[in-house]
Amino acid sequence: MLEKLIKNFVAYMGVASELELDADGSYVLPISDLVRMRVRQNADEEIIISAFLGEIPASMDIEKAYARMMEGNLFGHETGGAALGLDSDGHAVLVRRVPGEVSQEDFANYIESVLNHAEAWLEDLGLSKMEQE
């Protein structure tokens, strides 16, 4: 189901490049120059949409950045229902779980929502494109 959703989505977006799978089996979506997007299905058949925002630089007030992220997470208002946090490498990431049985239209809306919120958080946290790579 996920593979079909992904293929239809990238075709709709006009992406000509071949879909990539990363080391953990997630699809890498080549739809943004600012945010690295990945999509996978978990053991519960939920779809996990992840947007990697990058490392919070040491020059930044880390406590202030973490507090801002916690405020944004509260009730999901500033994250579109996604969760904003840190991965095991200390990089900021925005993650949204959605039902595995989702329509193509809803899937596209979820991807768009995560991407839009991720780009807003890049600006809010002051992370640049260089920090995404």
UniProtKB/Swiss-Prot annotation:
Superkingdom per UniProt: Bacteria
Gene Ontology BP term (one): protein secretion by the type III secretion system
Residues spanning the membrane: none
Cross-referenced CDD domains: T3SC_I-like
InterPro entries, alphabetized: Tir_chaperone
Pfam families, per the entry: CesT
Family label: Belongs to the chlamydial CPn_0713/CT_663/TC_0034 family.
Protein name as it appears in the record: Uncharacterized protein TC_0034
Organism: Chlamydia muridarum (strain MoPn / Nigg)
